[in-house]
C-alpha cells in the first residue's frame, strides 16, 4: 500500500486517476467488508499503543489529511477510526486562523494539537494550508511561502525524532466529483448544513490548487514523513486505503501490552479472599 500511493521522485499529481482503486480488487461491497475486517486489528493496535504510553511509552501517530473540499476528510475520521477507543484519539479540524493565531508564526497554532504519547492524532487540514491556500490566494508573499517548505520539513523531522510517526494523506478527487458532491449537498435537506457557498468560489481556483498541491507534495515528501496520494472519487476506497496506511504504520511500531508491575498470582489470591 505504501509504495503504491507514496509520492516519489518524478511524481505528477495530474497523472493520478482520482477514480482508480490501486491495490484493491473488487468494488464497494468488498471494500466495506475489508474495512470492517481491518477495524478490529486497528482498534487493538491503537489500544496497545495507548496502554504502552501509560507505562512510559513515548510513541504516537499523526495522520494529516489534506484535500479539496468535499473529498471526505470527515468520513475518514468517522469510518476509519470509529471503532477505535476514543480515549486514544485526538482529532482536530483547523479552520481559518484567528487574529491571535495570525499574530504568531504559522506553526504556533499547530503545536498544541500534536498527539500526546500513546495517541493517534488526526489533523483535518493542517500547517499545509499555509503553503496551499496562502499560495493560491496570495495571503502570504512568495518568498515567505518558499521558506515555509523548509520550515515544515524541519518541523516534521523534529516530530519524528521525538517518537511521532507521521502519515500525510492527500485525498485526491476530480473537479467533476466535487461538483456532484456539492450538488448533493444542495439537493438533500439533510446535507444542506454541509454546504458552504465559499466552496464554489474556491472551485474557480481549481487549477491553481492542483499546482500548489503538486509543489507542496514534492517539496515536503521526505523519508521521515512521506506523502501519500489516495484517489478519493470512491469514498469506500479512500477509507480502505487510509486504514491500510494506518495499519501498516501501527504494525511497524508493533506496540505490546505492558507487563504487569505487580504480582498477578498474588493479586488473584487477594481478590479471591474478598
Q: Language-model segments: which ranges?
A:
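A glycine- and Lys/Arg-enriched "phosphate-lid" helix/loop adjacent to the NTP-binding pocket
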Residues: 133-151, 159-211, 258-265, 272
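Glycine-rich phosphate-binding P-loop
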Residues: 63-81
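Pre-Walker A adenine-sensing motif
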Residues: 44-54
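Switch/connector loops and helix/strand junctions flanking conserved nucleotide-binding motifs
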Residues: 73, 100-103, 129-135, 161, ...
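Conserved nucleotide-sensing/catalytic segment adjacent to the nucleotide-binding pocket
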Residues: 23-37, 89-147
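Pre-Walker A (Motif I) flank of P-loop NTPase domains
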Residues: 56-63, 117-118, 225-226
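NTP-dependent small-molecule kinase module
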Residues: 211-214, 218-274
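Charged, amphipathic alpha-helical linker segments immediately N-terminal to NTP-binding catalytic cores
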Residues: 1-41
